[in-house]
């Protein structure tokens, strides 16, 4: 059994944990004896890839039989909510080898993307199987739609002071609006690991704030470089950090199941399902104010906003094929706005869409002179 993957799960959770974990431990030890990925010759590269692939296939075998049992053990039979970034590491403790530990992920985070063995792929397999189960998947979505633990204190501070500085995001009042400012100014307000928590907490505060009637998402003023003195809406994912391996896999799930989904569906309540038919949620109209450009994931956010205001000089792009990433649900949402063919051109062939154009106005509800953005928000 040490060198061979179990061909099937027995159905006994404890027995299968023991058998599969033993196999994954053995595989990890064999991989550790090989040179680091950049130093492998063709033979050792092929061996490493075959070991990883066999281990991943074994994870699917285990999870197809035990995903719900595992999820129920991690959530006390779905009586408690566990956010996805905790869930995967608690699963690593309960079923050794199924997914990487925090130490293993941290070790790979020190490498460039091209140098990694891809231990986080195993987190993807786990999340895939949890989300594929309707009951587990909906429960996990519910957990990610709840306000973050930090948001209660942040809301109190915002209501006391009228402003909130979260570092890479800020919340301000502008008339009847709570304005969430993306403030990763060094990187043109792109999104990365440093911005994620601040942005989601800021969104929670905007939605929960009873003194405001709408929430506005806007980019902060860039202090230097080509766009110095101008507001930039969102440059998408921080490609510099992506290249250097600083964007973890979980970042994508946390962003899209948290911040973006909260804009789209509102905040969940712990005692009521957040579905659109029989459930309930705390919602607020979201307005995006597009200045200069909305690139990649920034453009994707526009598709989840309720109303988009854009400057006449602004543009949108969604170069997902070039980046190797489909931002959130953009491949499904964009075609609802502009049709299938134009969506393909944007995603696959980097078509640039001017906000002040026939196609741009299919996404942007109101296009105004750049100096009129503030007045349009407060109108």
Task: Enumerate the predicted regions with their spans.
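Crotonase-fold acyl-CoA enzyme core
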Residues: 274-379
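Conserved CoA-thioester-binding segment of acyl-CoA-metabolizing enzymes
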Residues: 122-221, 227
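C-terminal long alpha-helix characteristic of the crotonase
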Residues: 21-44, 48-51, 311-314, 364-379
């Amino acid at each position: 059994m040490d060198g061979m993957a179990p061909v099937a799960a027995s159905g006994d959770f404890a027995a299968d944990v023991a058998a599969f974990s033993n196999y994954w431990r053995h595989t990890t030890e064999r991989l550790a004896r090989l040179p680091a990925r950049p130093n492998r010759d063709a033979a050792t590269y092929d061996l490493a890839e075959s070991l990883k692939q066999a281990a991943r296939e074994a994870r699917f075998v285990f999870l197809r039989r035990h995903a719900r049992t595992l999820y129920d053990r991690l959530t006390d039979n779905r009586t408690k909510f566990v956010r996805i970034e905790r869930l995967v590491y608690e699963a690593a403790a309960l079923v050794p080898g199924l997914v990487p530990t925090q130490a293993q992920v941290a070790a790979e985070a020190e490498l460039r993307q091209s140098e990694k063995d891809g231990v986080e792929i195993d987190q993807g397999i786990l999340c895939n199987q949890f989300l594929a189960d309707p009951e587990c998947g909906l429960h996990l979505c519910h957990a990610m739609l709840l306000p973050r633990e930090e948001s209660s204190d942040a809301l109190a501070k915002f209501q006391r002071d009228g402003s909130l500085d979260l570092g890479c995001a800020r919340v301000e009042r502008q008339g009847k609006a709570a304005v969430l400012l993306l403030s990763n100014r060094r990187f043109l307000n792109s999104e990365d690991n440093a911005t994620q928590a601040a942005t989601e907490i800021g969104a929670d505060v905007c939605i929960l704030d009873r003194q405001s009637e709408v929430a506005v998402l806007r980019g902060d003023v860039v202090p230097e470089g080509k766009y110095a003195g101008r507001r930039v809406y969102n440059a998408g994912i921080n490609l510099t950090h992506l290249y250097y391996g600083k964007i973890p896999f979980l970042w994508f799930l946390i962003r899209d199941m948290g911040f973006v989904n909260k804009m789209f569906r509102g905040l969940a309540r712990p005692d009521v399902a957040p579905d659109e038919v029989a459930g309930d949620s705390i919602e607020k109209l979201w307005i995006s104010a597009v200045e200069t450009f909305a690139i990649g994931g920034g453009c994707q956010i526009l598709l989840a906003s309720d109303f988009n205001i854009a400057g006449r000089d602004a543009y949108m792009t969604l170069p997902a094929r070039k980046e190797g990433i489909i931002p959130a649900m953009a491949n499904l949402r964009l075609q609802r706005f502009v049709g299938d063919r134009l969506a393909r051109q944007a995603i696959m062939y980097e078509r640039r869409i001017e906000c002040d154009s026939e196609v741009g106005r299919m996404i942007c509800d109101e296009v105004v002179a750049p100096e009129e953005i503030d007045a349009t928000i407060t109108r």
